[in-house]
């Protein structure tokens, strides 16, 4: 009789060891940066997207950017004047909560601030995000942007999408070869995909994507920075919850 898979014992020692080694490496890498860089920024990210963060790393390739556990990051910098790894560095600890990261740099702080002020990327919203505006699809023939641009500058929705639109809850139908809400003359109710301020589910985000409507904006917020020369921390935003999720461990 073959051995039951349920009876199989999985050894988790190796996984635990790997995680511990990653944390130790992150801790050491942060501490190694402290004497080699003039400034350390704490930042948070709205609507995290790995591909956009890679662009940031490429642009700031002479800096070091860390994403890691906030408690570990705080310990690496020091949380009190007694254990701070440099004068005043412990003052950054109050900004290390939620989904935040560190940027070590020798660039002038004004250059870093200017770069991030001008950095925004729009993207499709994900489930769990909050709608930034109300999206209403007008009745009548459907167009690819759902009324976001005038019909004369848009193209009709492909008939192949009609079954999926219906499956996602839109009361669509085919009228003379066109995908319509109501009838071709526009008689019928408009369809509200989402209302401003509501939390989006996967059905709503799929509909938004089908109509090429972007409600998400990738943005980096600089919260504060420490300067080695003065030992002072300059606040750029009031400390608070930068995000509910812990940061991923990444020290590249």
UniProtKB/Swiss-Prot annotation:
| Gene Ontology BP terms | nuclear-transcribed mRNA catabolic process; ribosomal large subunit assembly; ribosomal large subunit biogenesis; ribosomal large subunit export from nucleus; rRNA processing
Judging by the UniProt lineage, the source's domain of life is Eukaryota
What exactly does this protein do? Component of the ribosome assembly machinery. Nuclear paralog of the ribosomal protein P0, it binds pre-60S subunits at an early stage of assembly in the nucleolus, and is replaced by P0 in cytoplasmic pre-60S subunits and mature 80S ribosomes.
Keyword check for Translocase: no
Spell out the PANTHER family in the cross-references: MRNA TURNOVER PROTEIN 4 HOMOLOG, MRNA TURNOVER PROTEIN 4 MRTO4
Return the protein name.
Answer: Ribosome assembly factor mrt4
Gene3D superfamilies this protein is in?
Answer: 3.30.70.1730, 3.90.105.20
- Natural source organism: Neurospora crassa (strain ATCC 24698 / 74-OR23-1A / CBS 708.71 / DSM 1257 / FGSC 987)
Write the record's keywords in alphabetical order, separated by commas. Cytoplasm, Nucleus, Ribosome biogenesis
Q: Does the keyword Oxidoreductase apply?
A: no
Q: Which family does it belong to?
A: Belongs to the universal ribosomal protein uL10 family.
Where in the cell is the protein located? Answer: Nucleus, Nucleolus; Cytoplasm
Annotated GO CC locations: cytoplasm; nucleolus; nucleoplasm; preribosome, large subunit precursor; small-subunit processome
One Pfam annotation reads RL10P_insert
On subunit structure and binding partners, the annotation says: Associates with the pre-60S ribosomal particle.
């Amino acid at each position: 009789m073959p051995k039951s898979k349920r009876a199989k014992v999985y050894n988790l020692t190796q996984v635990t060891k790997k995680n511990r080694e990653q944390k130790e490496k992150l801790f050491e890498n942060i501490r190694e940066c402290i004497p080699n860089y003039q400034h350390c920024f704490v930042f948070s990210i709205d609507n995290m997207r790995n591909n956009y963060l890679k662009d940031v790393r490429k642009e700031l390739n002479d800096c070091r950017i860390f994403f890691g556990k906030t408690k570990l990051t705080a310990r690496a910098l020091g949380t009190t004047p007694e254990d701070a790894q440099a004068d005043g560095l412990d003052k950054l600890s109050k900004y290390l909560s939620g989904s935040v990261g560190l940027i070590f740099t020798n660039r002038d702080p004004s250059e870093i601030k200017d770069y991030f002020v001008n950095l925004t990327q729009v993207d499709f919203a994900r489930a769990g995000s909050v709608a930034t505006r109300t999206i209403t699809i007008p009745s009548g023939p459907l167009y690819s942007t759902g009324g976001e641009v005038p019909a004369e500058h848009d193209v009709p929705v492909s008939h192949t999408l009609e079954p999926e639109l219906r499956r996602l809850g839109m009361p669509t139908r085919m009228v003379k070869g066109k995908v319509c809400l109501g009838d071709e003359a526009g008689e019928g109710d408009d369809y509200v995909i989402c209302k401003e301020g509501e939390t989006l589910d996967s059905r709503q985000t799929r509909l938004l994507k089908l109509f090429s409507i972007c409600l998400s904006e990738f943005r980096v917020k600089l919260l504060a920075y420490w300067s080695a020369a003065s030992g002072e921390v300059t606040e750029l935003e009031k400390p608070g919850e930068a995000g509910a999720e812990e940061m991923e461990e990444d020290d590249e």
